[in-house]
């Protein structure tokens, strides 16, 4: 799923790409990936690295493109023996193009959009948006750690 967001005064969905908008790509199809590579000429290995569930967090720069891979919290299935894990979130940027790509639908990204819309403000620039993504990730890590600690305490008392 691909969503284009105007990020200037408020976070508002728009029908197509415009310079300086945010392109949020969640669970991209092969067609979505092809379009990103062809329309924006992003390095093809960026998307394959983001799709690798074991990819480590890192920063990379190639031909003017910046790639940041974050590991963000993800709950596989609450009934799973190990429901908590992390998945890669790719942030791709060059001049007037900012794209986030995650091959999983995560509560963090849903909440990030919802929270920014409730704030009623956009982002000052792509750096502001990236730092807010880092902050959101930290908040969700703390939330998941509290849940894990509660489960540990419950297991101790049983």
Predicted regions and their residues:
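Peripheral, non-transmembrane regulatory/ligand-interaction domains of membrane transport proteins
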Residues: 1-158
